[in-house]
């Protein structure tokens, strides 16, 4: 994957490209144990609903940021991946800004205190309890982690450090 100086970032991907984008994401996920697998079906749904922010290096997928709906006006900022060839603050920030624009309110979790602090200081997130994250997401935040395919991943991650549950409210 040859790095361009500025990857193209979009969440409005033409329908005829959905199959290729999903295949590339699944191929990248299969090679990296840190990527939480998502089904082809859920990725296609996210693409169809403009809830998958994708970074392209030339025409290849170089990163993605998944937004999972939690009801009207609320979404969970799911997994983000940026390929090392294009990794940098600008790509990540552009992807994050595009993801935050999807709904007025977002919930997220990280186990990296430094990253959580950056989100709080620079983007206006606030730290909340697990109960508050569940309430804001109308229970979806917990339900997703209890799904059979994701429970093992959730348990491994929660045992790896302190969880920082975060909520973002878009400024009015």
Q: Where do the language-model regions lie?
A:
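N-terminal charged segments
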Residues: 25-52, 145-152, 156-159
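Conserved acetyl-CoA-binding loop-helix of GNAT-fold acetyltransferases
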Residues: 82, 87-101
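A conserved beta-strand-loop-helix scaffold within acyl/acetyltransferase catalytic domains
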Residues: 33-83
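Conserved active-site tyrosine of GNAT-family acetyltransferases
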Residues: 119-121, 125
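Short amphipathic alpha-helix that is part of the acyltransferase structural core
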Residues: 1-38, 54-56, 162-172
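Conserved GNAT acetyl-CoA-binding A-motif
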Residues: 101-114, 128
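Short alpha-helical
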Residues: 20, 72, 114-115
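Conserved catalytic-core motifs of GNAT/GCN5-like acyltransferases
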Residues: 126-156
């Amino acid at each position: 994957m040859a790095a361009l100086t500025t990857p193209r970032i979009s969440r409005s991907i033409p329908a005829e490209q959905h199959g290729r984008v999903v295949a590339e994401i699944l191929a990248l996920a299969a090679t990296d144990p840190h990527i939480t697998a998502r089904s082809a079906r859920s990725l296609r749904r996210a693409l169809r609903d403009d809830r998958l922010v994708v970074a392209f290096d030339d025409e290849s997928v170089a990163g993605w940021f998944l937004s999972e709906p939690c009801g009207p006006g609320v979404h969970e900022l799911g997994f983000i991946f940026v390929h090392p060839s294009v990794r940098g603050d600008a790509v990540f920030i552009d992807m994050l800004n595009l993801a935050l624009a999807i709904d007025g309110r977002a919930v997220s979790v990280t186990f990296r205190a430094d990253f959580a602090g950056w989100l709080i200081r620079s983007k206006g997130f606030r730290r909340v309890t697990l109960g508050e994250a569940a309430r804001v997401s109308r229970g979806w935040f917990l339900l997703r982690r209890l799904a059979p395919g994701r429970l093992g991943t959730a348990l491994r991650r929660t045992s790896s450090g302190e969880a920082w549950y975060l909520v973002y409210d878009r400024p009015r």
